[in-house]
Structure formats: structure tokens, C-alpha cells
Amino acid sequence: MAAYAGPVDVNTANAETISAELKGVGMSKAKAIVEYRKTHGPFKTAEDLMQVKGIGVRTIEINAKNILVKTASK
């Protein structure tokens, strides 16, 4: 059903992909993740997602295998 079906790089994925691939993350939370990333820069760890309102430890735990955090090398 989902177009991506694999770990989601939360530093590059759009809100549609994030909401489709991460359990417990709807479009509202997915948009908040993208906005947080635009404002504060890339996430360094999956746990950094907890800085986004509505994302807690449980969301990170149930999606641990589906969250990918890549950082761009400059």
C-alpha cells in the first residue's frame, strides 16, 4: 500500500512519507517533524524526534527499525 516501505530518513523524507511509514505518526505530526527540521536543522539521532511536540518515547520505540537518521557530510 505504501510507496516507500523501508526505513525512513527523517532528515530527507516529506510529511507524506513519514506519516505513511511510521506507526502512530499522522499527517499533523509528520508536518511538525518536517517544520522542526526546517527550523532547527537535521536530526542527529532518532531520539531527537522527541523534541517535536507530540512525538514521545513510545513513538520512537515502536518505530525504532523504521527510523533512519542520515546526516549530510560537508
Positions of predicted regions on the chain:
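Long, highly charged, low-complexity intrinsically disordered interaction regions
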Residues: 1-21, 27-35, 62, 69-74
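Short acidic/histidine-centered micro-motifs embedded in hydrophobic/aromatic stretches
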Residues: 36, 52, 66
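Amphipathic, hydrophobic secondary-structure cores in small proteins
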Residues: 28-29, 39, 44-49
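Short glycine/proline-enriched turn or capping motifs at secondary-structure junctions
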Residues: 57-61, 65
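Acidic-histidine catalytic/liganding microenvironments
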Residues: 22, 40, 52
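Residue-level recognition of oxygen-bearing side chains
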Residues: 13, 48, 54
